[in-house]
Amino acid sequence: MNVPAPLPPCSILLLAGGRGQRMGGRDKGLIEWQGAALIEHLHRLTRPLTDDLIISCNRNIDRYARYADRLVQDDDTDFNGPLAGIRAALPLARHRWLLILPCDVPLVDAALLRALREKASEYPERPIMVREGQHWQPLLGMIPVAHAATLEAAWQAGERSPRRALEPLQPVALQLEAGDPRLANLNTPCLLTGISENRNK
């Protein structure tokens, strides 16, 4: 019987610092789904995987603190997008890799996170990014913390897109089928309700 090789430790970043425009300005990570806040679903999944769990949040700091080892905030109040949270977390990560997840993907499972970490072990110098069909998902992946300075330089040059900021580093795809249900992005009230109804059938 083959025992899977142990995977190197990683820091984990949960992105919850957005404006929540599609949710009417509500703090998305704290919206309840299936009896718990979205951030709590991801906390349950990721807590056993790391001793360095980081949440990027820009409001409700006290509520998020219970779910993380550390919190990071953007350095201004303009809600500049997920790259702001990534650049804040990368220099602080305690491990070689930073695994990144947005707060609104509660159907992501342990098998997907393991696949990301296995791919990272194969390509230790390059970012790993989920690709669903032909579409990249730049907020689902892993970044070597050694690239913190590169992303910071992109930020200072005016780049705000995680995909474009990572492009020069030649991301490696973790290929998934189009429509993989684990990637359901519950970022509107209708999607939250629809997924809940489907799971309860």
UniProtKB/Swiss-Prot annotation:
Which residues are Mg(2+)-binding? Answer: 104
Q: Does the keyword Transferase apply?
A: yes
EC number(s): the record gives 2.7.7.77
Q: Looking at the UniProt record for this protein, which Gene Ontology cellular component terms does it annotate, in alphabetical order?
A: cytoplasm
Q: State the needed cofactors, names only.
A: Mg(2+)
Record-annotated residues binding GTP? 15-17, 28, 74, 104
Q: Which CDD domains match?
A: MobA
Gene3D superfamilies hit by this protein = Spore Coat Polysaccharide Biosynthesis Protein SpsA, Chain A
Enumerate the catalysed reactions.
Mo-molybdopterin + GTP + H(+) = Mo-molybdopterin guanine dinucleotide + diphosphate
Task: Tell me the GO BP annotations in alphabetical order.
Answer: bis(molybdopterin guanine dinucleotide)molybdenum biosynthetic process
Keyword line? Cytoplasm, GTP-binding, Magnesium, Metal-binding, Molybdenum cofactor biosynthesis, Nucleotide-binding, Transferase
- Could you name the domain of life of the organism this protein comes from? Bacteria
Enumerate the subcellular locations listed in this protein's record, separating them with semicolons: Cytoplasm
Chief site of localization: cytoplasm
Q: Which GO terms describe its molecular function?
A: GTP binding; metal ion binding; molybdenum cofactor guanylyltransferase activity
Q: Domain text from the record?
A: The N-terminal domain determines nucleotide recognition and specific binding, while the C-terminal domain determines the specific binding to the target protein.
Per UniProt, subunit arrangement is: Monomer.
Kindly give the PANTHER family that the UniProt entry links to this protein.
Answer: MOLYBDENUM COFACTOR GUANYLYLTRANSFERASE
For this chain, the family text in UniProt reads: Belongs to the MobA family.
User: Any idea what job this protein has?
Assistant: Transfers a GMP moiety from GTP to Mo-molybdopterin (Mo-MPT) cofactor (Moco or molybdenum cofactor) to form Mo-molybdopterin guanine dinucleotide (Mo-MGD) cofactor.
Q: What is this protein called?
A: Molybdenum cofactor guanylyltransferase
Tell me the organism's taxonomic lineage.
Bacteria, Pseudomonadati, Pseudomonadota, Gammaproteobacteria, Pseudomonadales
